[in-house]
Amino acid sequence: MDFQLTDRVVVITGAGSGIGLATTQTFLAEGAKVVAADLDPSAAGELSNSVAALAVDMSSEDAADFVIAETMRMHGRVDVLVNNVGAFPFRESFLAVSDAEWHELMNLNFYSAVRACRAALPHMIEQGRGAIVSVASDVGRAPDRFFVDYSVSKAAILMLSKAISIEFGPAGVRSNCVSPGPTRTPAWDRPGGFGDSLAAEYGLEKEAAIEYFAKEVRKLPLQKVGDPDDVARVIAFLASDVSKHVTGADYTVDGGIVAAA
């Protein structure tokens, strides 16, 4: 589908792998110019000359200002901001999560988005238009006990997006969320990653454990975990003028988890 994104300037955080990398690929296919921010943005930077890869730690307080300033220096505008960067550490219990761990997770998952929005919004307002798409999660609505701080951070993202949509809609800025369910990013397949953890938990081979997780544990109506491309396409839709009357929304890309809850 033509999302009418040719020459749009798109900033994507966490663009180096998983959903962020798939989103970069999707925007490039639509003709956009991408600024890819990540600790290691090399995979995104190798995709095309239309990608400006910025190696940056989005959890640092000045990272967002730097990324947006570089975007303005290179392109003179910012049309789309995709808040994607984040981590989802497994927690044995709420009681096992220290203050330091709470602060670290919230700083990366939530405050990075706060700072990125604050840096990008003045330019979008001056332009009279802009689109912000923030990646939340199905557990932002229905928390997972093993990802307690992650769940809270994504609930906060949902409210941040809605608040921005209300205040800045009159200025021509739209703000929406995409809430993925289980999505098979590299974190599932790296040694010692989520796939191996599931295999150890259920006493199965990794592929069988992932299938069991989807069908029997999370009970996805579609009975399989999603792919990063599934999420990326919805992000591109929400960033485009095809969705010009959509703001303050949360699109679930979860295989039916929320519907079945």
Regions found by a protein language model. Name each.
Residues 137:
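Residue(s) in the substrate-gating loop at a strand-loop-helix junction
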Residues 177, 200-242, 246, 255:
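C-terminal helical subdomain
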Residues 117, 153, 161:
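Active-site helix of classical SDR
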Residues 88-91, 142, 235-236, 247-261:
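Short C-terminal tail/terminal secondary-structure segment
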Residues 122, 166-167, 244:
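Alpha-helical segment proximal to the catalytic Tyr-Lys
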Residues 169, 174, 246-248:
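Short, small/polar-rich loop/turn modules that mediate ligand/substrate recognition or access, typified
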Residues 92-94, 98-103, 216:
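Substrate-binding pocket helix/loop in short-chain dehydrogenase/reductase
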